[in-house]
Design a protein with these regions (language model features):
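PRPP-associated nucleotide enzymes
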Residues: 1-187
Length: 187
């Protein structure tokens, strides 16, 4: 698909940054097997490109978070749920997600995966949005850091209607991905 005008991060810029991240991860792996845990749906495009840049044996696992609103004794709260994760005891683990915003979901996943006693566990994200953070969590690797609270579309991230994941570049709504409103026909 062709590039959209106003891309904040071009396909070439993303590719160069992902290649650099792959080299950094490879250096730290020292040739050891790396278990990559990819968060669905957002992390798969970034993870695929990143894994191809890692010079070490890689095993890929996928997890999906489910966030539910739970009410108990009249108090509402949000809870994060994951299915059973892979067996990671003694393994080097890299959790890959597209965006680190509040950090709540990633922190929960890191704690949950840490229960299986991996040798090491690290977090890689394409976009780090520290201004949105609600927990004390920093990524070990990040592609780009942004102060924008805009919705990002492309390179695996979808617009509200689910489209745009296939775009090679990454754009925020402020940079030209805002969709035109479609008026329905009057009956």
């Amino acid at each position: 698909m062709s590039s959209r005008k106003g891309a904040a991060y071009s396909a070439a810029r993303i590719a160069a940054r992902v290649a650099a991240l792959g080299k950094e991860v490879s250096r730290e792996c020292e040739g050891r097997r790396l278990d990559v845990v990819v968060t669905l749906d957002r992390g798969f495009v970034f993870a695929a490109d990143l894994m191809r840049q890692i010079d070490a044996p890689v095993v890929c696992h996928f997890v999906r978070a489910e966030v539910r609103d739970v009410e108990q004794s009249g108090h509402a709260r949000r809870e994060v749920f994951f299915g059973s994760g892979p067996e990671l005891k003694g393994r080097d683990v890299l959790v890959v997600d597209a965006v680190l915003e509040s950090g709540v979901t990633q922190e929960f996943l890191l704690r949950r995966l840490g229960e299986s006693k991996p040798r090491s566990i690290r977090l890689a994200v394409l976009l780090d949005k520290p201004a949105s953070r609600r927990v004390a969590l920093e990524p070990d690797y990040f592609g780009f850091r942004t102060a924008s609270n805009q919705v990002w579309v492309g390179y695996g991230l979808a617009a509200a209607n689910g489209t745009g994941r296939n775009l090679r570049q990454l754009s925020s709504e402020a940079n030209g991905t805002r969709r035109k409103s479609v008026k329905g026909r009057k009956k």
